[in-house]
Amino acid sequence: MENAVRDLALKHALINAVKFNGKADVKAVVSKIFADNPELRGNAKQVVEVVKEVVNYVNSLTLDEQRRILEEKWPEALGARRTVEEKRGDIESLPELPDADKLSKLTFRFAPNPDFYLHLGSARPAIVNYAYKLKYANKGKDSRFILRFEDTDPRIKRPLLDAYDAIREDLRWLGVKWDEEYIQSDRMSIYYEYARKLIENGGAYVVAKGSGCEPDDWKRLKIEGKPCLTREAESSRNLELFDKMLEGAFNEGEAIVAVKTDLSSPDPSIRDWVAFRVIDAHKYPHPRVGDKYIVWPTYNFAVAIDDHLMGITHVLRAQEHRVNTVKQYYVFKAFGWEQPYTIHFGRLKIEGLKLSKSILKKLNLTKDDVTLPTLAGLRNRGITPEAIWSLILFVGIKETDATISLKNLYAYNRRVIEPLANRYMFVKNPVKLRLRGVGDLIEAKIPMHPSYPERGIRVIKITGEGGYANVYVQASDVKPGLVVRLMGLGNVKVINVSGNEAEADFIGQSVEDARRSEAPIVQWAPPDAVNAEVIIPVNVGQVTVDNGLAEPAVAKLEQGTVMQFIRYGFVKLMGSSNGKLRLVYIHD
């Protein structure tokens, strides 16, 4: 028996740990084991001891190790494989990419800047690029998907140290698996090497204080479409200036490396754009490499070099990168490299929801706040990866901007969780309903899920005393003279309502009688109901709260359980505090 219990404990401890950021809870694991294997309750003491031992072991592992073991032993628990398999049809229907059939190998990439956490908008390039990798892999093509952290701006777009792991966690949750991973701040020597090569072949030059081409003059001349002195200088002179940059001879703002482009371009930003700049490493240390470097490549230079060296064949990204694609062209041209095929898709806008990274950062909320459109926030709220995949693949890679409602996401999510979520009763703004004419005992048999009778029922017993019994109902459900059916319990006729109390006659348990009188069916809570509050996200950083009573069975559920409160909506159990259950509203 011990080996079987140990396996169960390991499985559920890993699931619990992965769900709650690497830390499993003994009580939650024990509850899950007993719920699935009630025959083990007779050996409760031994089971608890085994679980404690296993939980200690699991909690000593890193989150990555926990995920790896869970994926190896119980891959279905992560849901990632199911997500991808269910979306196979949508993936196959994606439009073909240019020359994909002619190339022997296809390589895609997702390249986030770890200056913030992934949100619904940034999930789009991750899912789209990975979906194309799968599309062609399913056809037998050699296809790769690369995760690349673009973190070479410690000054303006300063990386967050915890964002690297947070992004990895979000991608795994989405079911996105990468074949290779790179971090640009680990590749500085490579960028320096190619900067020298570009300067040597005349494709770049240095603008520096005291060089005959002052930075302020260079900016003015560029706007005028005129060259600066060092633009035509010998490469040896520019290499000398570049070495001085690396040695720390120039302060921030005193030297840059510029890529030669077209000074007559109608877009001034394309004219001789900055490839490297000096950043004060003591004032702006990089969170990963500290003050090791003072000369940092700009986004477009590092991306162009990496896309070539990593063999990227197709780039799928947002319309806002169109100018960047043009800028990067000049690096590819200078080296004689072939630029990847680039497909630009429109912006994804969610009605009434802020997806701007700069706006979200200013709110100073935790990344998993249930009001945020971050993937961590959506996951915490109860949105599934399957729903996000459905939404992103529905929008596709159209060039036009797409504006959708959150209702679209909720509709996709409802399809996923409706068959999984068992039904429970919750009474908002409760009033005590005193029933007259009841026997010593009445029972309600409530199905766990009306569409899945094999899940069974739960029995709620109400004890009568002297012909009376008490239950709780929603204040708006009772009016004098109204006949209602208390779900699964019986039919009552409301006699009077006064403040927080009401009185009704118990008139039988016949379902047929209720139908004939067209009695509305209402949810209710027994006398031993538990206090509960439901947090309802209204907008980013804003919530309202519904207080009420939940049936006792809800208190026995594992934290994180998604359920449907009858006549209310889908909710997720977040925990409890001071004897009150805390849940978050997902959607109706």
Swiss-Prot record:
GO terms for biological process: amide biosynthetic process; glutamyl-tRNA aminoacylation. It catalyses: tRNA(Glu) + L-glutamate + ATP = L-glutamyl-tRNA(Glu) + AMP + diphosphate. Keywords: Aminoacyl-tRNA synthetase, ATP-binding, Cytoplasm, Ligase, Nucleotide-binding, Protein biosynthesis. The keyword Transferase does not apply. Its main location: cytoplasm. Its EC number is 6.1.1.17. A motif ('HIGH' region) lies at residues 112-122. It is found in: Cytoplasm. InterPro entries: Gln/Glu-tRNA_Ligase (IPR050132), Glu-tRNA-synth_arc/euk (IPR004526), Glu/Gln-tRNA-synth (IPR000924), Glu/Gln-tRNA-synth_Ib_cat-dom (IPR020058), Glu/Gln-tRNA-synth_Ib_codon-bd (IPR020059), Rbsml_bL25/Gln-tRNA_synth_N (IPR020056), Ribosomal_bL25/Gln-tRNA_synth (IPR011035), Rossmann-like_a/b/a_fold (IPR014729). Belongs to the class-I aminoacyl-tRNA synthetase family. Glutamate--tRNA ligase type 2 subfamily. It comes from the Archaea. The keyword Cytoplasm applies. Catalyzes the attachment of glutamate to tRNA(Glu) in a two-step reaction: glutamate is first activated by ATP to form Glu-AMP and then transferred to the acceptor end of tRNA(Glu). Pfam families: tRNA-synt_1c, tRNA-synt_1c_C, tRNA-synt_1c_C2. This is Glutamate--tRNA ligase. GO terms for cellular component: cytosol. GO terms for molecular function: ATP binding; glutamate-tRNA ligase activity.
